[in-house]
């Protein structure tokens, strides 16, 4: 069976994360597998929320010349998961960036020049570029300023991965009109979660 101590640690972590995010865990279900059908704990969640009145950001508002910013270094989570699983014989102490993003997103809603924002989870920041191209016909030019921690880059260099495609679970990518970028970065730099925020690219007509 599964150790009670480990289960208690998981539940405590869940409670802490819910408190930090300002959400309630309203329901739950458990299932016990027969021996040999699986090991450990599998967690799946469904979030239910309410769209705030007047919230305008949408991919359709993105325009040529808009600027992309990110709240912090990319690829931490994807790399941390690989190291935790000890895949490819690699080990390390890199910590996942997993965390609530509401403190990052809410302040930007007051900016008229906010076009769109999203967390770069599955597929990383590169997937956001692909989605923008598919939805709007506009491309993304990423700049050399994209922040990647040295341990993340080292793992990617060894394994042939691109950090732009690695998942981030506590970051936000925001797209803004050029004259609102400085205001957005100032807001993020005033938060612990956004102190490493930087500009990372520009929207341009697809070539």
Which role does the model predict for each range below?
Residues 1-207:
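Helix-biased detector of long, well-ordered alpha-helical tracts
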């Amino acid at each position: 069976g599964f150790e009670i101590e480990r289960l208690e640690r998981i539940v405590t972590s869940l409670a802490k994360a819910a408190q930090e995010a300002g959400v309630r865990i309203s329901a739950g279900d458990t299932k016990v597998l027969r021996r040999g059908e699986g090991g450990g704990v599998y967690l799946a969640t469904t979030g239910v929320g309410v769209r705030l009145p007047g919230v305008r950001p949408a991919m359709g508002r993105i325009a040529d010349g808009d600027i992309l910013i990110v709240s912090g270094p990319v690829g931490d989570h994807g790399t941390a998961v690989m190291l935790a699983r000890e895949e490819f014989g690699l080990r390390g102490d890199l910590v996942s960036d997993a965390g609530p993003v509401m403190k990052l997103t809410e302040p930007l809603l007051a900016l008229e020049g906010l076009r769109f924002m999203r967390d770069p989870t599955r597929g990383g920041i590169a997937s956001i570029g692909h989605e923008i191209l598919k939805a709007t016909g506009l491309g993304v030019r990423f700049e050399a300023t994209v922040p990647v921690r040295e341990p993340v880059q080292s793992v990617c260099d060894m394994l042939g991965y691109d950090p732009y495609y690695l998942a981030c679970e506590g970051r936000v990518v925001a797209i803004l009109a050029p004259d609102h970028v400085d205001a957005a970065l100032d807001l993020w730099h005033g938060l612990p979660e956004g102190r490493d925020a930087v500009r990372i690219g520009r929207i341009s007509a697809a070539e």
